[in-house]
Amino acid sequence: MVKKVLLINGPNLNLLGTREPEKYGTTSLSDIEKAAIEQAQLKKNDSEVLTYQNNTEGFIIDRIHEARRQGVGFIVINAGAYTHTSVGIRDALLGTAIPFIEVHITNVHQREPFRHQSYLSDKAVAVICGLGVYGYTAAIEYALNY
């Protein structure tokens, strides 16, 4: 079982709860992070979830690199728009060799065509999209039991 999971959220996800609530719901990123941390605590086996959000690609890459040094065993990532553009985030995930799940609140395949391409999904253990914020719960549960 993985003891340490890193939950990464990319650009604009800090606006959850107020950004396009008809699409993303009204749950804030803070609420999602708190729920993930509590989910790990309920395991009662010293599991923990670390959380990180940044709007800047380079800082996200740096955080992925840091995860390896911290002994993170699994990453759950919603890279937001960087999903569709960032070779750098893909390479960072591959370079650290930490297994990861890609999460999206909306079903990206029902949205604009440019959102159908992911630079991450072919290397992810799994992709969860379209389940709303429950997708985070499912991903964290899987990661904690990996």
UniProtKB/Swiss-Prot annotation:
InterPro entries: DHquinase_II, DHquinase_II_CS, DHquinase_II_sf. The record marks 19 as: Transition state stabilizer. PROSITE patterns: DEHYDROQUINASE_II. Keywords: Lyase, Quinate metabolism. It catalyses: 3-dehydroquinate = 3-dehydroshikimate + H2O. Its EC number is 4.2.1.10. One of its GO terms (molecular function) is 3-dehydroquinate dehydratase activity. Pathway: Aromatic compound metabolism; 3,4-dihydroxybenzoate biosynthesis; 3,4-dihydroxybenzoate from 3-dehydroquinate: step 1/2. One of its GO terms (biological process) is 3,4-dihydroxybenzoate biosynthetic process. It comes from the Eukaryota. Substrate binds at residues 78, 84, 91, 105-106, 115. The active site is at 24 (proton acceptor), 104 (proton donor). The keyword Metal-binding does not apply. Is involved in the catabolism of quinate. Allows the utilization of quinate as carbon source via the beta-ketoadipate pathway. Belongs to the type-II 3-dehydroquinase family. Homododecamer. Adopts a ring-like structure, composed of an arrangement of two hexameric rings stacked on top of one another. This is Catabolic 3-dehydroquinase. It comes from Candida tropicalis (strain ATCC MYA-3404 / T1) (Yeast).
